[in-house]
Regions:
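Flexible "arm" and connector segments at domain edges
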Residues: 1-143
């Protein structure tokens, strides 16, 4: 399945069912609170990501909390959104060490998430944030 190949490519860690259920519930809550077409579409893509990641992780009995139309609609937004984020963090990682593969898809515009990622990969937080902010200015699709 194409989605499983994509998840393998991103190489995100697999977690237990409880972790994925919590993640999916949090994304559903954010979707319910979203206002405006683009924000709703973006949050829908986050739900699709959480769901497909859980399925990829082996949790096959998890129920899709969206209609098929919503799923497909979210999928169309999810693939480029998360792939671009992943490529963004890979590029930042390579700026520290050509062998450093940062596998992250979090929103790089949220400073606290940048700090978490820097800690996870044992990188200087301030340098990581500065490089991220500088690169964000050139990556218009992440704005």
């Amino acid at each position: 399945m194409l989605i499983n190949k994509w998840h393998r490519y991103l190489n995100m860690p697999k977690h237990d069912l409880g972790w994925h259920e919590k993640d999916l519930n949090e994304e559903m809550d954010e979707l319910k609170e979203a206002k405006g077409f683009v924000n709703i579409w973006s949050e829908m893509s986050d739900v699709v990501y959480a769901y497909t990641r859980a399925k990829y992780s082996g949790h096959l009995k998890l129920k899709l909390p969206l209609s098929r139309v919503q799923f497909i609609f979210g999928l169309v937004y999810m693939l480029p959104k998360y792939t671009i984020r992943w490529k963004f963090f890979r590029k930042i990682g390579k700026s520290f060490d050509k062998n450093l593969n940062i596998n992250e898809v979090r929103n790089p515009k949220k400073i606290y998430k940048l700090e978490d990622i820097a800690n996870k990969y044992n990188l200087d937080k301030e340098v990581f944030k500065k490089r991220s902010e500088k690169l964000l200015k050139r990556w218009i699709l992440l704005k």
